[in-house]
């Protein structure tokens, strides 16, 4: 389906790695520090893709317009910074997927809404990312996804035309950004979403239930 592709770009959390345990732990520590009971990790998991907003929403029912949100957010960031590599791992099949891309000589990179403060040290700490051509964070350009600017910056950095790139993500904003950047788009219907989640209205070029299925779309192996 994507035989003419020269590069693959990925979202990070929920697409390549499962960071929900560390994100949830950072928020839950804030509860226990205040004498509140711990919440089960399963409560945090569905909102892991929403970052601090999602985690504080679960932990405290707090929305971004709350007068203390910025204070709580920075505390959450400090907690997460201290634990972000403790329980985070690649989704099943991702290590093999990346190995196949490397073997085929396809360039690949990451475009995430995670700020560089976290995205850069996290990816440096994981061997999975040693062959990534670029890591673009949510604050690398003036705009985050769903704006296409981060994807276009990633394509520019690796020297591949956007039309020759595939972007893979697990959120509708990923598909919106990819389409706006004129890239092929793939919805990752695994990870945080689960196989029962309906992604049809995202209008991605394709949907995958496992990382291996991306190789099939790329006509690999």
Where are these regions (language model features)?
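Asp-based, Mg2+/Mn2+-dependent phosphohydrolase catalytic module
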Residues: 1-7, 42, 102, 115-116, ...
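N-terminal helical cap/lid subdomain that shapes the substrate entry/recognition surface
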Residues: 2-96, 102-104, 115-117, 128-129
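Gly/Ser/Thr-rich helix-start
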Residues: 15, 50-55, 94, 110, ...
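Conserved SAM-binding loop
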Residues: 16, 90, 108-111, 167-168, ...
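Residue-level detector of anion-binding/catalytic polar loops
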Residues: 37, 107, 184
